């Protein structure tokens, strides 16, 4: 089966006191090639844990990850990661950061140069390619992180709240850029976010996860990502059904948060 499969994933963490925490339980889903999926849920629902398992940074207690029908173990070049903080090399300029992956694979400049230059242009970094990382704003640094990930040409891009630290205007611009690159590259993307609006705009599929243990609570199929590729995102928010779905999800997550607080108070 082509695409990314998450097969019956469970994750339990052992604690120093001898007890354990069930972070995820029986999570299964399949993403077709080129799908854009956003993942929402209250704190502690296992969103980042799930992403780290897909990336290969964590081995699940049960279940497995498969790419195109083959089980995968540990990180590899098929899956690229974009973090909330860019994790960039401060001592390199923008172009050297973006071309780092191809260079580490032993490619010559003649092999990767045109691809890297295209990524710099499409992400708006062409005029900044010789700049040091510390000279860039947070939004520009995230552009570098995204371009660096794409330079490795992964099949799947995993994004862990990559826009969470940005101001509102920069965040909106970056959301538009993510949609543009998704359509241009045809990559499969999983995006973790705490923002309901962002999840609606950047997810043709949207998963809401529930906590303790982390599991899939509800799934939505949405039109807004496709609409946003060629439209102002502020106009997309005025689309039929957008506000109703937004309020439904907000209420759902609010109820989960209330339940968590109730459990915590009862345990004290």
Curated annotation (Swiss-Prot):
Ranges in coiled-coil conformation: none
A Pfam family that the UniProt record links to this protein: ABC_tran
Subcellular location: Cell inner membrane
Domain annotation ABC transporter: ranges: 4-236
Membrane-related topology note: Peripheral membrane protein
CDD domains for this protein: ABC_NrtD_SsuB_transporters
Keywords: ATP-binding, Cell inner membrane, Cell membrane, Membrane, Nucleotide-binding, Translocase, Transport
Sequence positions that bind ATP: 41-48
Gene3D superfamilies reported for this sequence: P-loop containing nucleotide triphosphate hydrolases
Claim: Zinc-finger is one of the keywords in the record: no
Catalysed reaction equations from the record: taurine(out) + ATP + H2O = taurine(in) + ADP + phosphate + H(+)
Cellular component GO terms, alphabetical: plasma membrane
E.C. designation(s): 7.6.2.7
GO molecular function: ABC-type taurine transporter transporter activity; ATP binding; ATP hydrolysis activity
Function noted in UniProt: Part of the ABC transporter complex TauABC involved in taurine import. Responsible for energy coupling to the transport system.
Subunit structure as annotated in this protein's UniProt entry: The complex is composed of two ATP-binding proteins (TauB), two transmembrane proteins (TauC) and a solute-binding protein (TauA).
Similarity remark: Belongs to the ABC transporter superfamily. Taurine importer (TC 3.A.1.17.1) family.
PANTHER family in the cross-refs: TAURINE IMPORT ATP-BINDING PROTEIN TAUB, TAURINE IMPORT ATP-BINDING PROTEIN-RELATED
Protein name: Taurine import ATP-binding protein TauB
Organism per entry: Ruegeria pomeroyi (strain ATCC 700808 / DSM 15171 / DSS-3)
Gene name for this UniProt entry: tauB
